Amino acid sequence: MARVLEVQGVSKRFLGLQALKGVSLGLEEGEILAVIGPNGAGKSTLLNVISGLLRPDSGRVLLLGEDVTHLPPEARTHRGLGRAFQIVEPLPELSVRENLLVGALFGKPRTSKREAEAWVDRVLELTGLAPRAEAL
């Protein structure tokens, strides 16, 4: 299997606090990784570095072999890398359908709008939300 995500020797400090020190990990295609630990262990910092919300002080983040360490979050998202926050909330200015479409379009690389819309329609039917699809 191909290595999809690789974190190489990532470190991050906040003033005098060492949040991450030499963190390395790799994910193969289809693999799932759980990051667990107590409050303050650096879990959110690691996810923020991987997703581009924070820049590491040292180390690299590779996506499908490409170094994305210095790319902004939106460029990483367009390459298929994003994150969900602990409290997931829909975008309030978008309808139910549009919120699902955001995930369908940007959650998978190279998904056409037609494929994404078909997926959204299936999800709306499966969840019973089709009657509320256009609600904000």
For every predicted segment, state its role.
Residues I36-P38:
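The feature captures the beta-strand-to-loop junction immediately N-terminal to the Walker
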Residues S51:
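Helix-to-loop junction immediately C-terminal to a conserved catalytic motif
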Residues K113-R132:
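Conserved ABC ATPase "signature" region
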Residues R60-L62, E66:
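ATP-binding/catalytic-site motifs of ATP-hydrolyzing domains
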Residues R55, D67-I87, R110-R114:
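ABC ATPase NBD coupling module
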Residues E93-A104:
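Short coil-to-helix segment of the ABC ATPase nucleotide-binding domain corresponding to the Q-loop/switch region
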